[in-house]
Amino acid sequence: MKSVEPIRDTKTIKNMRAILKSQSTRNELLFILGINVGLRISDILKLKVKDLTKLNTKAPKDYVIITEIKTRKTKKFYIGDIVKKEIENYMKENDNPGFDTYIFLSRKGINMPITRQQAYRIINNAAESLGIVERNDQGNLIHGEIGTHTLRKTFGYHSFQNGTSLELLMDLFNHSSKTQTLRYIGITEEQKKDVYLKSNLG
């Protein structure tokens, strides 16, 4: 399987969000949370109401501390205003679910989160409806690789474009080199070239 890509265009992000919002607040929050906190999908899907909201008011927390499934390391991430608003919408639309309820609740079983495969289909189908992903009549991919890892890579790509240092992103992603991080967040040679061509100082 080819490596998935970040979503580089902010208009596409808005269009993806609109499609997912039309489906459910769950799907919209999955997307918005994923592109704003940079967690792996395995860590996103295990989140419960008690992880994202305050015990006394059920208002969104300012930050969350989790143990990453892959690394077993403790990770602290902060919740910005856009994500907080989505959490509030989610709580309202879902009649204030209990604290032990999974945020990304499956319709199958009792209090079970959606699977990675379900999350992939949610994101990939939205991308396909926008023409980002195209398949032939046999269902094989023609172009576009969008999946759950796209969310994390989109966070990294736009953080870098907005001035976050490469060293900080390396730390956030637990990478061992700058080259690894640049490749991971989808900074291509063509984009590196643009940096120089757009620099016309003096």
What are these model-predicted stretches?
Residues I69-E88, D100-N125:
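C-terminal catalytic core of Y-nucleophile DNA break-rejoin enzymes
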Residues E68, F173-K198:
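Catalytic-site neighborhood detector that most strongly recognizes the C-terminal catalytic loop/helix
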Residues M1-K14, K73-I82, P97-G98:
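DNA breakage-rejoining catalytic core of tyrosine-based enzymes
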Residues K46-T74, Y78-V83:
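Conserved tyrosine-mediated DNA breakage-rejoining catalytic core shared by Y-recombinases
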Residues R135-N162:
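Short basic/aromatic active-site micro-motif
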Residues T10-I41:
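Basic, Lys/Arg- and aromatic-enriched nucleic-acid-binding interface segment
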Residues K46-T53, M170-S176, I185-G186:
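A short, basic/aromatic helix-end/turn motif that makes direct DNA contacts
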Residues D43-I44, I146, G156, T164-H175:
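Active-site-proximal segment of tyrosine recombinases
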